[in-house]
């Protein structure tokens, strides 16, 4: 089975163009998985997750890899305050744009913190969290 990514942009509020790759397989979709990458020089969804998306897609998941605001091919507003609320707002706008009512979130590093923040703000929209080397988690 060949899985071909489709690169697109979601035009969101304040002129934000959020870039994403969507991987569709030819089998019935089980659920939607959103991959949220971490930060760092050259960070993007594809650079973080290029070795993971095929496995999910081949199991029948609708798989979407986003470039978070400020990274990859997504808009990089210079006047924005890149807070957790900023990222979760745009993640929610993206899910609404794609008509996704519930998703599995996979977050790496900063992406994990965004996934946690999103799950806390919108618990009904997240079915599962998969976290890797996540920031924003306190040890108690």
Predicted segment positions?
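N-terminal cap/lid segment of alpha/beta-hydrolase-fold proteins
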Residues: 1-18
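Active-site loop/oxyanion-hole signature of alpha/beta-hydrolase fold enzymes
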Residues: 13, 21, 58, 62-106
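Conserved HGGG/HGGXW glycine-rich cap/lid loop of the alpha/beta-hydrolase fold
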Residues: 16-73
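Flexible, active-site-proximal loop/turn residues at the rims of small-molecule/cofactor binding pockets
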Residues: 40, 78-80, 135-136
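Conserved SAM-binding loop
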Residues: 43-55, 92, 105-114, 134
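Short amphipathic alpha-helical segments
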Residues: 47-48, 76-77, 118-119
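Conserved hydrolase catalytic core segment
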Residues: 100-140
